[in-house]
Amino acid sequence: MLKFSNVARRRVPVVLVAMLLGACLIRPSGALAGTSTLDGIYTGAQAERGLTIYTDHCEMCHAPNFTGNPGAPPLTGLEFLFNWDGMSMAALLDYVKTMMPPGEVGSLSDQEYVDVVATVLQANGFPAEDSAELPTDPDALAGLAFQRPK
């Protein structure tokens, strides 16, 4: 069994706290500023790209104003917000990629799907971030929460 001196025992918690605080302060270049839709997890430019894709592939069912049509649910408003509240952005993107567009599932690139999701976030009034785009990486998206405004 390892034995630690009293000095070593006192230093371990201090070192651990310092490491945790340091990890919280570090933001690698290109890292997302926030961890939820309320923090700004996409850029305005990304939403603009997504709007073009939405117009070409989505609005015929979901309407130009994102309000939906019979058989195609709204992508804005309380129903949409409550449906996804508390879910990860990975879950939302996975749903979009595996279900949309009907008859053409998987026809868009990962970046195009993410850009459309950014457009939907913008249409719901979620804030944009200045420089860090919503990522295509599923692991990164899993750490981002869809959180409705309270």
Region locations from a protein language model:
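N-terminal secretory signal peptides that target proteins for export/translocation
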Residues: M1-R10
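Electrostatic cytochrome c docking/interface patches
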Residues: S29-I53
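Gly/Gly-Pro-rich "capping" loops immediately C-terminal to redox-active cysteine motifs
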Residues: G44-A47, T67-P101
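Short linear capping/connector segments at secondary-structure termini
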Residues: T35-S36, P74-F80, T136-D139
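Flexible coil segments in periplasmic/lumen-exposed cytochrome c-class electron-transfer proteins
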Residues: V105-K150
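The canonical Cys-X-X-Cys-His
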Residues: G50, Y54-N65, V116, V120
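Bacterial N-terminal signal peptides
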Residues: V14-R27
